[in-house]
């Protein structure tokens, strides 16, 4: 079995998440063929404006690759996220993403395509 390669995904267009008043964008790039335990990876971008409030219905890892985010969960844990920071969001985590400029994250989640 051969591997798959996706060249320069950070230069690709990332469509809007279509959340009113929130400048959030997300694109799934690679999806596993495992129907029982799917894995999906891609890019998430947030631009300055309203915060994005999101509750994870799946487990996800997110690596900050550019810009910055303020990430706060329902327990009050708050981090000023910068490139190189890695996050694990367990299923059920309620989190708020905010940025004063923009942030870009690479994610890998235990979900199927388009299930974010």
Ranges and model annotations:
Residues 1-38:
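A short, N-terminal "cap"/entry segment at the start of jelly-roll beta-barrel domains
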Residues 46, 56-71:
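Short, conserved beta-strand element in jelly-roll/cupin
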Residues 27-30, 40-56, 90-91:
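Conserved short histidine dyad/triad with adjacent acidic residue
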Residues 75-91:
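Short acidic-glycine-tyrosine-enriched beta hairpin
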Residues 42-43, 52-56, 73, 79-80, ...:
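Short histidine-centered beta-strand/loop micro-motifs
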Residues 41-43, 61, 86:
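Conserved hydrophobic/aromatic beta-strand scaffold that supports enzyme active sites
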Residues 35-37, 46-51, 68, 113:
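Short, charged/polar surface micro-motifs in flexible loops or helix N-caps
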Residues 91-115:
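Ligand-binding loop in jelly-roll beta-barrel domains
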């Amino acid at each position: 079995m051969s591997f798959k390669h996706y060249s320069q995904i950070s230069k690709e267009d990332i469509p809007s998440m279509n959340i009113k008043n929130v400048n959030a964008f997300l694109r799934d790039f690679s999806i596993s063929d495992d129907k029982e335990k799917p894995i999906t990876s891609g890019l998430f971008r947030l631009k300055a404006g309203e915060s994005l409030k999101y509750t994870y219905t799946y487990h996800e890892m997110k690596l900050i690759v550019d810009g910055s985010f303020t990430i706060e969960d329902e327990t009050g844990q708050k981090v000023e996220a910068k490139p190189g920071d890695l996050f694990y969001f367990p299923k059920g985590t309620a989190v708020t993403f905010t940025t004063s400029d923009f942030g870009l994250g690479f994610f890998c989640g235990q979900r199927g395509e388009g299930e974010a």
